[in-house]
């Protein structure tokens, strides 16, 4: 399988005509944000980013020296000793400063009567708005919106937060400028830090419960893992939802569209 993967990488690099990666990004940095998973989808992205097949081959050989490397289907998941899984690094054509975002964001006291202080985004409204303002179809609007969420959850400019598991936030909460002046800001920042600190361990441990192409990720056990890994320090009852949105927006799901959620790919799951 390794030989097939390397051949695929060579072909992809030839097709893109690029053998040089961005000077400020190593292959390991790139793969970390792809879930430390080397397979068909990430090989395409690695080639587009200019990472050569020799470097990919060397990384796989390094992983071969450990017993922790996972091979599942056409994928190789590198061990944490070589590569730590990071939240997906993705960039959307929708920016948080765009006028469409501002128009669909509530005032900070817009939901005060419901007991929620914060600037909440009307996500469905935003997807409809960019179809009009940018001429996108539903699938393009969905793709860029999911990327927008993943990008800004990663940077901490968005959150989906409440400490009450029986309550649902009004929407994704923007945490920039005056919109960050909310009572829960310290707890939100702590939950974001815990999420990112434990991202590698949580994804790897949860993947054993998820079958690629069949089951959902994160699994029903994810929040139990969160509480154990953070020793009960996490207060965000919706961390699992944030992680799911980040991985979908990061392209770790196959077949996601305006009408289909898609299915997870490694490292989120294992093939049977």
Report each predicted region and the residues it spans.
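Short acidic, hydrophobic short linear motifs in intrinsically disordered regions
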Residues: 34-48, 115-131, 219
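A cross-kingdom marker for long, charged
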Residues: 227-272
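Sec/Tat signal peptide C-region and signal peptidase I cleavage site
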Residues: 16-23
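Short amphipathic alpha-helical interaction segments
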Residues: 50-65, 136-148
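Positively charged n-region of N-terminal signal peptides that target proteins for export
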Residues: 1-5
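A short, conserved structural fragment
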Residues: 64-75, 154-162
């Amino acid at each position: 399988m390794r030989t097939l993967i390397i051949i695929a990488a060579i072909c992809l690099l030839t097709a893109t005509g690029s053998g040089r990666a961005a000077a400020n990004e190593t292959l390991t940095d790139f793969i970390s944000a792809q879930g430390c998973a080397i397979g068909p989808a990430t090989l395409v992205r690695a080639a587009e980013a200019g990472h050569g097949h020799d470097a990919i081959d060397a990384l796989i050989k390094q992983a071969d020296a450990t017993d922790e490397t996972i091979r599942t289907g056409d994928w190789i998941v590198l061990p944490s000793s070589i590569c730590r899984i990071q939240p997906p690094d993705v960039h959307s054509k929708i920016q948080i400063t765009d006028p469409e975002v501002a128009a669909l964001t509530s005032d900070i006291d817009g939901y005060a009567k419901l007991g929620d202080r914060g600037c909440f985004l009307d996500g469905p409204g935003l997807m409809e708005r960019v179809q009009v303002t940018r001429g996108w179809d539903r699938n393009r609007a969905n793709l860029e919106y999911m990327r927008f969420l993943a990008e800004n959850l990663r940077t901490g400019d968005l959150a989906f937060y409440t400490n009450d598991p029986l309550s649902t936030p009004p929407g994704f909460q923007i945490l920039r400028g005056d919109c960050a002046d909310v009572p829960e800001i310290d707890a939100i920042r702590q939950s974001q830090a815990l999420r990112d600190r434990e991202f590698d361990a949580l994804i790897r441990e949860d993947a054993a419960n998820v079958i690629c192409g069949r089951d959902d990720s994160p699994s029903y056990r994810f929040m139990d893992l969160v509480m154990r890994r953070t020793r009960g320090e996490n207060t965000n009852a919706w961390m699992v939802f944030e992680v799911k949105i980040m991985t979908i927006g990061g392209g770790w799901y196959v077949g996601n569209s305006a009408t289909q959620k898609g299915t997870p790919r490694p490292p989120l799951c294992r093939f049977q």
